[in-house]
Curated annotation (Swiss-Prot):
PROSITE patterns: PX (PS50195). Residues 1-59 are annotated as: Disordered. It is a peripheral membrane protein. The lineage of its organism: Eukaryota, Fungi, Dikarya, Ascomycota, Pezizomycotina. Residues 70-192 form the PX domain. Residues 20-32 have a biased composition (Polar residues). One of its GO terms (cellular component) is phagophore assembly site. The keyword RNA-binding does not apply. The gene is snx4. Pfam families: PX (PF00787), Vps5 (PF09325). PANTHER family: SORTING NEXIN-4. This is Sorting nexin-4. Belongs to the sorting nexin family. A 1,2-diacyl-sn-glycero-3-phospho-(1D-myo-inositol-3-phosphate) binds at R113, T115, K139, R158. Sorting nexin, involved in the separation or division of vacuoles throughout the entire life cycle of the cells. Involved in retrieval of late-Golgi SNAREs from post-Golgi endosomes to the trans-Golgi network, for cytoplasm to vacuole transport (Cvt), and autophagy of large cargos including mitophagy, pexophagy and glycophagy. It comes from Emericella nidulans (strain FGSC A4 / ATCC 38163 / CBS 112.46 / NRRL 194 / M139).
Amino acid sequence: MDHDDFDSVSWRHGPDSDISRPTTSGTDTAESPETRRDPNGKRRMSSASEIPQAGPHADALDLAGIGDGVLECRVDTPIKENDGTKDAYISYLVTTHTDFKSFQKADFTVRRRFTDFVFLYKTLYREYPACAVPPLPDKHKMEYVRGDRFGAEFTTRRAWSLHRFLKRLTLHPVLRRAPLLAIFLESPDWNAHMRLRGSRASTSGSDGGGTGIFDNFTDTFVNAFTKVHKPDRRFIEVREKADKLDEDLTHVEKIVARVARREADLETDYNDLATQFRKLVPLEPEVEVPLQVFAASVEETARGIKNLKDHTDQNYLGSLRDMEAYILSVKSLLKTREQKQLDFEALVDYRNKAVAERDSLAANPSSYYASNPLTSSPASFIRSKMEDMRGVDHEQSRRERMRKLELRIDELTREVESAKTTSEMFDEEVVREVADFERIKAIEFRDSLGALAEQHIEFYQGVLNTWERFVAEMEEEQSTGDAHPNA
């Protein structure tokens, strides 16, 4: 994928704009979405007129609601479709609640498969290169190899990851306004839209995609061996914090994975304990009731441990891995920003070399056609000899070269100004993206840790209730036995 094509970047408003908030705002009133332009003069992406399913009260400026709008999504209930055929797949229920007028209803549901999410991600990644688009969960190739991709554990884990993906989109101040996201959440004709949009993308890519891919690969390859002359301390700190967070999450992930394995071992041990106590019933029939009640209590505790283990493994552990992937998206955006700065600095170097050569020709004309190889540069000596062989007037050749250098300097000056503007605007975009990432990360950590705490509270409350009930039953059994000693 390519982050270097900024002809279609949808630049956001300045730092004082309300659009930097998670809620949408009606600050785009200066011109309609159809006529808005980016810094390069290209038409900005997306317009409300492209949304065929927009509600009857939708406004052209209201792509995702104006003001403090609500957009909440939930992904759950995986179901196997076309079971028993070679085209079987898993679909997920996407439930949306919103007060945006661009939608036809406030509450609606659709079913989407994983490839639909992939299409949504790739399109957003391509159309919003200045955003750190949240990544999708990995394909989990081992599940595909083992044939477990239809298993409940795998599909539940993926449903949680897809839920986090959509929630990150709805919390992003720009991506939540993407027309494609609205279509994805509501449209009953999603497959037709996906085919139509895919054909358009392939057509536009075939028009000039080969050269663009080669140019971008060349730029990336060259920049890989180049260092920024004036690194920005802001982004160095962001990169260092991202690396540290990634490292810490890796350690936490390993610990949580070990905790999940131990919870699975505890579940097995408790189930084995209940089984062994039930085997004592035929051997000790006089204490059958206490043995059965104790075994049932142990089994209930094992079920509680299983629920806790499932949440730890499928939800919380997955949230850590998804956050690691999200951090990689931010790092990729930082790398793209650095490449833009490298492009600007390279253009400045080219212009400075051209200016130095022009000034040298103007200050010392004889250096252009020096005939002594000991006192002139090899290039000047070879050029002078070649012109002598062709009978070229050295002075006229020098003036022609100065004229070309002037034109080249003017062109490079314009390119430098354009690259500087693009680099500075992209810097501001990255600053906003980092702030959005920090906000989304804080919300996600709060929710995931809160859900984990609630699961532990529910588990321990269940354990307390189970064994208090067991003690009460045993006391009742004992009091009954004391009241009827001869029974």
